[in-house]
């Protein structure tokens, strides 16, 4: 799949979500990193910008605008724009599933989910459950205007694919062959004494750099071929979800 005309306001989630909700650039609302933000490292040349810990209350969201104009509004899935008082219900949403869970990611993708009391049934997969909740919401609100913000927890840590899809990609991986180093090293741009390309290439084969750990002081590892079958399975499960929920919405009589 090639995305030839796509845009994201930021490379991490919280600022992009804030932009989707408000139409504002992340810097204009002082929300430029995932919440709660990252610490400063001793080797950094520049300090990280201060980050608001929630979506500012004075910002008007698309959910608020639509709710005030007669739409039913709901978010299903991940919020990650603040905790406590700065929850979806405070920013224009009538419903939030799972209610009260405002963390950045789940503890696991298989039930019990432990999402503030939202547990699921044994063996259920979180992406599929969110899909079911979305189609249920659409059906329940098909006779009037509604806004549904479908915000999957996937694809995010912990990387846990649906079992049938994991097996699918396990079989596919067994048929694939790749020659060359599994990863290369790139220097950290904040390194005060950057490693040369030759030094980086020579370090790839030392024991200290085995596996896929990130050493932020000096180097970052870049995988050269994708072999994570759990990740692939998570992506396909989310694609399946969109393939289910979008047609349900498109076939409503009033075209919501």
Per-range role (PLM):
Residues 1-61, 65, 71, 95-96, ...:
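Active-site segment of extracytoplasmic enzymes that catalyze sulfate/phosphate-ester chemistry
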Residues 11-12, 16, 22, 46, ...:
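Residue-level signal for the start and early helices of compact helical domains
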Residues 14-23, 51-85, 112-146:
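Active-site-proximal alpha/beta segments of enzymes that process anionic O-linked groups
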Residues 27, 81, 155-157:
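Active-site micro-motifs of SAM-dependent methyltransferase domains
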Residues 91-92:
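Short, structured coil segments at secondary-structure junctions
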């Amino acid at each position: 799949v090639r995305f030839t005309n796509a845009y994201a306001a930021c490379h991490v989630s919280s600022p992009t979500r804030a932009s989707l909700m408000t139409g504002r650039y992340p810097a204009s609302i002082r929300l430029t990193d995932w919440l709660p933000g990252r610490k400063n490292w001793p080797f950094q040349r520049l300090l990280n910008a201060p980050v608001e810990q929630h979506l500012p209350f004075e910002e008007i969201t698309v959910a608020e605008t639509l709710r005030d104009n007669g739409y039913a509004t709901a978010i299903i899935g991940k919020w990650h724009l603040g905790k406590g008082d700065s929850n979806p219900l405070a920013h224009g949403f009538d419903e939030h599933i799972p209610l009260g869970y405002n963390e950045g990611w789940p503890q696991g993708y298989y039930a019990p989910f432990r999402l503030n009391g939202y547990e699921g049934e044994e063996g259920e997969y979180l992406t599929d459950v969110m899909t079911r909740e979305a189609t249920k919401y659409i059906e329940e609100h098909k006779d009037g205007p509604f806004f549904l913000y479908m915000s999957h927890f996937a694809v995010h840590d912990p990387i846990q694919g649906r079992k049938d899809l994991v097996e699918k990609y396990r079989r596919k991986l067994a048929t694939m062959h790749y020659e060359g180093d599994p990863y290369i090293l790139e220097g950290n741009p904040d390194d005060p004494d950057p490693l040369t390309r030759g030094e980086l290439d020579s370090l790839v084969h030392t024991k200290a750099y085995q596996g896929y750990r990130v050493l932020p002081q000096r180097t970052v590892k870049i995988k050269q071929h994708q072999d994570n079958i759990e990740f692939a399975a998570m992506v396909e499960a989310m694609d399946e979800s969109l393939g289910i929920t979008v047609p349900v919405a498109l076939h409503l009589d009033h075209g919501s």
